Amino acid sequence: MSGFAKLKSWLYKASLFVSLILLIGFSVVLPIDSIAQASKSENNAFNTFIVVGALVVFGVFCIFIIIGRMLFHKSCLKDIPRRYIPITPADLPHRSSREAVLQNMERSKELTILLKKPKDPVIHDGLEPPRRCDYPLDEKLFPEYLNYADCIKSLTDRLKYHGLFLNNLDVRMNLEDTFADVVNSQFVNHNANKIQLEKAKEFIDLYETIRFSGKDVTRDQFIKFVKFCLYFGEVSLTRDTSFANLHNFKLNGSSNNIGRTESEYSINPFDENEYAQDDMHYFPEPPTHLVRESSISTVARHVSSGVDLTNSEEHPLDTDSDCNALRLKLSKADSYRSVIRH
């Protein structure tokens, strides 16, 4: 604001103040004089009552007019649309104000175009970002809008309500044991592997930081947590003693021998009555671990009852073509009882 504009503003405010003082001073003289004249007359009480009553009525009438004007002004403002911008001289007589409004409108338009698409990917903690907001060079590992905290909480819920820790069902724990207690009992106690001990401590620290820090889980923390789960899942598989009982199976993945050898799981591998029993009869105890069922190594096959072994033994298999023909015949004769899953 220039010096001349400041001078004009100061003169306007000063003159307004002086005018208001004079108006109030002259207005007060009339009621004071009326009260003084009424008190000197013969009927002092009656005249005073008339003068004071007239002043009260005048005051109430003025207040009523002011309130009515305020309500009328408010109703007029309601008729104006909220998105209406006063840019015309009739709405906003002050020229500088109109120019400021127009300049801000142009600036808002430029900012809208500039900020419509962020310069860098916007990734918030706690949720997996959508593909359009992700870094182009990063591999998409998880579904969009995946809640990291819910996934981590499901691990403890499975441990708490189902007794399942990672992929091990045989978890010896008490009701008051925490996640850290289970990790210590599984991978820290009586363990001489320094790498596993270090990773187990990092696993516990990371879990407690995620669950009890009160902050959203970052993407790096969640990826690190998943890596720890996969690592200790593989460790628990290799340390599971129930795998030692499965070495007696002769799998047909890389051998021409179809069937099973004599073992503690079956007295006679070609006994049809034994095959009619439950599949879990072949195991000394139910398995206590989770395994993949998609690989060849998890399926053991035996000769189905639909194959004529007598005729096959009368003609020894001398050539590869005979072996292939028998293998094709066996594959067509398999039933659901000829598959043992573990």
Swiss-Prot record:
Keywords: Membrane, Transmembrane, Transmembrane helix. The chain crosses the membrane at residues 16-36, 48-68. Its main location: membrane. GO terms for cellular component: membrane. Residues 37-47 are extracellular. It is found in: Membrane. The keyword Transmembrane helix applies. It is a multi-pass membrane protein. Residues 1-15, 69-342 are cytoplasmic. Required for growth under high-pressure and low-temperature conditions. PANTHER family: DEFECT AT LOW TEMPERATURE PROTEIN 1. Belongs to the DLT1 family. This is Defect at low temperature protein 1. It comes from Saccharomyces cerevisiae (strain JAY291) (Baker's yeast).
